[in-house]
From Swiss-Prot:
Tissue expression remark: Expressed predominantly in roots. First strongly detected in all cell types of the root except at the apex. Later expressed at the root-shoot junction.
Glycan attachment sites: N46, N53, N204, N267, N331, N342, N461, N477, N536
Organism annotation: Arabidopsis thaliana
UniProt cross-references to SMART domains, sorted A to Z: PBPe
Cellular component terms (Gene Ontology): plasma membrane
Function as written in the Swiss-Prot or TrEMBL entry: Glutamate-gated receptor that probably acts as a non-selective cation channel. May be involved in light-signal transduction and calcium homeostasis via the regulation of calcium influx into cells.
Keywords: Glycoprotein, Ion channel, Ion transport, Ligand-gated ion channel, Membrane, Receptor, Signal, Transmembrane, Transmembrane helix, Transport
Listed name of the protein: Glutamate receptor 2.1
Family that this chain belongs to: Belongs to the glutamate-gated ion channel (TC 1.A.10.1) family.
Amino acid sequence: MKRENNLVLSLLFFVIVFLMQVGEAQNRITNVNVGIVNDIGTAYSNMTLLCINMSLSDFYSSHPETQTRLVTTVVDSKNDVVTAAAAALDLITNKEVKAILGPWTSMQAQFMIEMGQKSQVPIVTYSATSPSLASIRSQYFFRATYDDSSQVHAIKEIIKLFGWREVAPVYVDDTFGEGIMPRLTDVLQEINVRIPYRTVISPNATDDEISVELLRMMTLPTRVFVVHLVELLASRFFAKATEIGLMKQGYVWILTNTITDVLSIMNETEIETMQGVLGVKTYVPRSKELENFRSRWTKRFPISDLNVYGLWAYDATTALALAIEEAGTSNLTFVKMDAKRNVSELQGLGVSQYGPKLLQTLSRVRFQGLAGDFQFINGELQPSVFEIVNVNGQGGRTIGFWMKEYGLFKNVDQKPASKTTFSSWQDRLRPIIWPGDTTSVPKGWEIPTNGKRLQIGVPVNNTFQQFVKATRDPITNSTIFSGFSIDYFEAVIQAIPYDISYDFIPFQDGGYDALVYQVYLGKYDAVVADTTISSNRSMYVDFSLPYTPSGVGLVVPVKDSVRRSSTIFLMPLTLALWLISLLSFFIIGLVVWVLEHRVNPDFDGPGQYQLSTIFWFSFSIMVFAPRERVLSFWARVVVIIWYFLVLVLTQSYTASLASLLTTQHLHPTVTNINSLLAKGESVGYQSSFILGRLRDSGFSEASLVSYGSPEHCDALLSKGQAEGGVSAVLMEVPYVRIFLGQYCNKYKMVQTPFKVDGLGFVFPIGSPLVADISRAILKVEESNKANQLENAWFKPIDESCPDPLTNPDPNPSVSFRQLGFDSFWVLFLVAAIVCTMALLKFVYQFLKENPNQRNLRVLWEKFNEPDQKSYIKDVTKCQCSSGQGMPKNGQEGANAVNNGN
C-alpha cells in the first residue's frame, strides 16, 4: 500500500513539472504578424485561405518546439489593383507585418512589390505568374509558383513535334496576358515558326467583342492557336468558339497551365466546349503526404475542389513559417519616419529591421512540399516537369510529359535516352483526340473560309513559251495560260490532299524580279512561272522545291576542225610514218631482190629493169598480187611478213581517210567562261538573274547582249562577235534543253559556270503552302506524271536532236589523230628482224660458197651469176613478165631439177 502511494506521488510530481515547463515554453513563444492579401469571396481565394490555415495548423502541430507563431491578418483586395495596394500599405504601416502572402493577380502584385522593396517586407505570392514581375528586380519578391514563361518550351516542343509552321497566340490584354508573349515569340523563332497575327482579348470583353475576334480568326489561314486567358474569360471564349465553328476538325488549340490547372473545378458545360484541345499542365508528383492531405481535404471540405494553387499556398505558408523560425525573434521592429514631418503615408512608409534576415532565411528554405520540391532560385520556383493533357470527356487526359533534358515523353518514369529528331509523335505522346472528335493530326492551316481565292501571278512576256504561254481568248477576252510550268503546278495541286482555289493573274509590267516583288508586297499570293531560285530573291519570298534540273549552262557554237583540201589524202599518216613506209618499201623490195636475184629469172636482167623490179614488187603488193614469183624460202617469209604489215597499214589508212572525208569533227569555239572574260567577248543572256551573275563575274555592260527568243539567240550566235553578235550565251539548264533540242547541230553546252537551285514556285515568306507544295512536287517527280509533261513540252523541234539532258553531247567533239609510227613500230620491227635474218643467212651461204674470194668485184660478178647449185636453177622466167615460162608441168620441172643435181 505504501508503494502504491509513493508511485502516485511520483507521477503527480512529474505532471506538475511538465505543466510548469509547458507554461514556460508558451510564455517564450513570439507572435510574428503576417499579412494576407486576397480576393475574398471567390472560389479560388477561399480555397487558398483554407490551405494557408491547414498549413499553419499542420506545421505547428508537427513542430511544437518552435519559438515563433505566425499571426495572420487577411485583407480583401476586392479584385482591384488600387485596393490591393491600399491593403498592403495598411498592413505594413498599421499592422507592421513582417511578410505578406499574396496577392492573387499579377497586376495587383506590381505595386505591392515596390512597397515591399522599400519597406523591406517580403512579398510571397502563390498565384501571380506573369514573367514581367521579374523585371522589377526586387530581392524582396518571392514567387512560390511557376513563371508563365517556364512552360513555353513545352509548347514549342508540341508545335515542333507536329511540324506546324504558323501559330496565332490568344491572350488577355493585361500584364498577365502580355507577360508570356516575348518569351513565347523567342522560342517559336528558334524553330522557324511564324506568328502571323495575335488575338488580344480585353479582360472586360463582351460576348459580342469575343465573337468579332473569333470571326476574324476564322477568315485567316492559321489553324494553330495558343490560348493564355484566365479561367472565366477562357470559358466564355471557348463557348463562343464552339458556337461559331472554330472547334471543328482542322483546328488546334493549345492551352497554358493557367487554364489546365483549374480544369478540375470547371463544370461539365465548360469542359464540353473545350473537347479536343491540348494543354500544358503543372505537374504535381505523387507522394504520401499529398494523398493524406487530399484525403483530409475531402473529409473537411467535400464541396470545395482543390487545385495546384491551393498546394502552392500551403507550401508558401510552410516556407514562410520555416524562414521566420530560423530568422528568430530579434529586431521585430519598424523604423518609421518622424511623425512631425508633413509627408504622405507612402512617403512615410516604415522600414522593417527584420526584413534583411528574413530575406536570407527565405532564400535558403528547401523542403519537399505538397506540390513538389520547394526551393527558391532567384526568388522563384523552378519547374522540372510539365504534364501534357488532352481535354476529352469529363476533363483533361494525360497524354505525356515534358522535361527540359528529354523533351516530350509518354511516361514520367520511362524517360527516353535522348531527344530523337526524327521520331514520330506517336513515339512521344499517347493517342490524341483532336477537335471534331478525330484522331487525324490537323495540318495546322487551310485556305480561309472567307471566299478568297489564291491570286497567282503569271508572266505574259516569256522568252521560252514552252514553260509559260499566254494567249487571248477572243470570245471571253480573258488570258489563257499554258505551258510546262502551268501543267506542272496543276499536277502538284492535284497531289495535295485538300482543295485549293486559285486564279491566274497576268503580269506584264516588268521582269521576273518585279513579279516576285509583288508577292512580297502582298499583291499576289504566289507566282507560277519559270522563276529561278536565287539567294537574293529568297530574302523576301519563299520558294518551293525546284521542279526542274538546276544549273546555268554556257552554250557556244561548234565548228569543224578539219580543213578539207586537195592534199587531205596525206593527213591520215604523220610525216615520219610516210617516210618510214617509203623507206620500208624500198628495203623490202631490195631484200627480196637480193634473195631472188641468183635463183629467179624474174629478178634478173638489165640494171634498170632490176631497179624497177625492186620498187614494182614491193609497191604492187598494196593493190594486187605481183607478177614476179618468189621462189626462195627466206624471200617468201619476208614477203608474208610484208604482206601483213601492208594490209594493216592500208586498212588503217583507209579508215582514217574515210573518217576525215565523211565525219564532222565538231569542236566548240569557246571552252569556258574565263576565256570569254579574258578576251572581252560578247555574251548573251535572257534573265535578270543571269545578268546579275555576269556583272558579278566582271563582264562589262558593253559585252552583255540580251536576247528575247530562241530564234533571236540563234541569230546572235550565228553572227558571232565580229558581225555584231555574241560568242556565247548563258541560260538555265531547262532552257538549254529547249534550245539545243532545236539547234543541236550548231551549238553545244560546254560548261555550267554557275550553280543555281533550278526553277521553283514563289510564295510569301512563311507561307504554310510551301511545305505542302514541296511535298507534292516530290510526289509528282516520283510518279510518271513528270516524265509525261516533259515529253509533251520539251519534245525537240528537230527530231534528229536527242534530249540534251540524257545525251548532253549528240555530236561529240572528235579530236582527229594522225596515224604515227608509234602505232605500227612492232610490225616494222618484226619485218626488220626477218629481213636481217634472211640477209644474214644469204650472206653466210654466199661467202661459204666462195670462201677464198675477197675481191668485191669478183664477188659482185659471182652474185650476178645464176646459182648452179640451187635446186631451182633451171626455172625459166615467168611468161607474164617476158614471154618465157616455167616448165609446162610439174614432171618437167622435177626432171630439170634432177638433171641439175
